[in-house]
Amino acid sequence: YEPKIEPFDAGQLSAFLDLGNIMLTQNARSLNTVTVSGKQEDIRMDKKTFNVADNISQAGGSVLEAMKNLPGVTTQDGKIQLRGSDKVMVLIDGRQTALTGFGGQTSLDNIPASAIERIEIINNPSSKYDANGNAGIINIIYKKEKQDGFNGKIGLSGGLGALWVKRENYPGIRSQYQGTPKINPSLSLNYRKNKINLFLQADDLYTKTLNKNEFVDRFYDNGDTVKQQTKRNRTTNFSTVKAGLDWSVSSSDIITVSGLFGTEKILDRGDEPFFNGSLSERQRLWQFLEDELKTTATFSAAWQHHFKQPGRTLNVGLNATFHREDEKYFFTNIMPEYTGLDSFKLLSDEHVTDLNIDYVQPLKHGRFEGGVKFRYRYIPVNMDFKPGIHSVLDANAGGMAKYKEVIPALYGNYVYESNKIEIEAGLRIEYVDLSYNVNPGHPTYKSDGYHYTQPFPNLRLAYKVSANNKLSLYYNRRVDRPNEVDIRIFPKYDDAEIIKVGNPALRPQYTNTFELGDKTSWDKGFLFSSVYHKRMDATITRIASTIPGSTLIYNIFQNAGKSYNTGIELVISQKVSNWATFNLNLNGYQNIVDSFTVVNQYPVENVFNAARQDLISGNIKLNGQFHFPKQVEAQLTAIYQAPDLVPQGKTFSRFSVDAGVKKGIQQGKGELFVNATDIANTLRIKREVRGKDFRYISTDYNETQVIRVGYNYKF
């Protein structure tokens, strides 16, 4: 055909554009091969993407460990935080699953990172995504080969943690775990031929861990002082198998079917001694054994139809999940006058079904996407307390509880892009009907629930200052619904004198977010900067309180009124030479919690008042990537977290350094690596909490230092 010039803006936001019909004049001649090449950006204004293989210092560990080196991400108490908040929605391959939690975050510290290809961070999600998670979304993408034929990867890593004692035990209790082993074999297989692609992934992560070694000093207004230690030796074995197939039924239709089965076995052996203020008298020794088995099974089926117009697609997906938690606790309560034996058994079965329909229509200057989603979630929980002689368990607080939620939703999202302007505007409307039915004989709580129909808009306006500079303005509204464990009515006794209890009267937390971001690129680097402000209504948090005549502390979830988070984030990347690249991430923010008053119902009604709290916090993360001759690569990461605000108190500063080295062997098919986390063993978690007539300071000397070695081979 004769050449024809038709100017248009390709942009970066849409893979396909509708340019209409372009009429060409025929002119038969041979054409040379046309090659389109390019490299995907890792840091974009709307999404940050990170390959797990580049995270050398955390290779062979868990997904949680792999994520703590990423810009804007911190970890605390086994959860991810984005910009200081743990209200994060975690997806696997774009979907919520019981493996990582539907409402909160679970098991991230036990899922092997060896099965993961990349991790995506979205701070301001569009209406296409579910509305929960005010801090943003983390999408974990499993590995899937795209080469034809049979190929795969095998790997084996091992390590040791708790190499030396951070702090000695109080006298008279069992030893801490030391020299804790970590073993992670992994296998990935893929066969692609013609219209069929088959895939299989299997991983096993076995670890022993000094999971908790917390020393708490409690001070009461009446002059009493209690010193305690909570030491938890944990043994975990987490196994997963994922398999499936992609079938190209025709040139326009693809069917994908996959399933995942996982088991997580946890054994916790704990000791909790309680002393007077001078440590001259042991008042009590609480020992426990937790035997827990978690079983997860998921099934996914998806149909994708490609219309004749390129990029116009219809996707229909069905996801079903079953997740069982089978917990057995055994307690020994050693008092000066007697020894008591207690136990309980908890069985929780989670059933979730999701159906979604998504449609994408390319436009000349962008695209339109819309869809519907329906979720049904049902969780019956049975708690059976078995009190012994002189029992301290609240046996009347057991029984059945049934959690049920129904969520239909629909959304529309419009994307426009020209040579200077980008617009993304969307609206998601969700209806939620949640009920929580409890045992009618429960001494404190009654059945509860809520329902609402709410809009969740999102807006992004961007101006391209130049080819290397873009300015973006964001707004979105999101919700964090209480998870089932947040409203669970059964007291938890893994800490005998700081008891955690849920609250069925909890209501959703709503967040409005405003952000102004800028990205400036140059030849060998870039600067990403943003200023953000979040306003939270009905903030969900735990409130610590006491009741008259008792030194026991009850941690109960409550809606604590309004809170605010205002901050600035910077990500600077610079390739300083052919062998070294440095990334510096700085995140500073101010947390404010307004004054509030709550009424705790458990174990008896009591009122708690808190004054306004205000604290400036943040974190600094320096990451160096080094490329040496003979296929040798290295990584060094240093992380500092400033003191941070929590309702009723604060957490203190923390610091750690991680490092790793890997070498390619066997003509690039093999790889050896060695790494170490928290090299200097400096990481401690220290908190201060103030209540109505008490305060306590806790410092956790849990295991953070681990050395690993491993080998991977591709075929």
PLM region spans:
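Membrane-proximal, glycine/serine-rich, low-complexity loop/turn segments characteristic
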Residues: 10-11, 15-16, 39-271, 290-322, ...
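Conserved "repeat-terminator" motif of extracellular CCP/Sushi domains
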Residues: 19-30, 38-40, 140-145, 596
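Extracellular loop and loop/strand-boundary signature of outer-membrane beta-barrel proteins
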Residues: 171-175, 224-231, 282-289, 338-345, ...
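Outer membrane beta-barrel strand-and-loop segments of large Gram-negative receptors
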Residues: 352-356, 397-399, 403-404, 503, ...
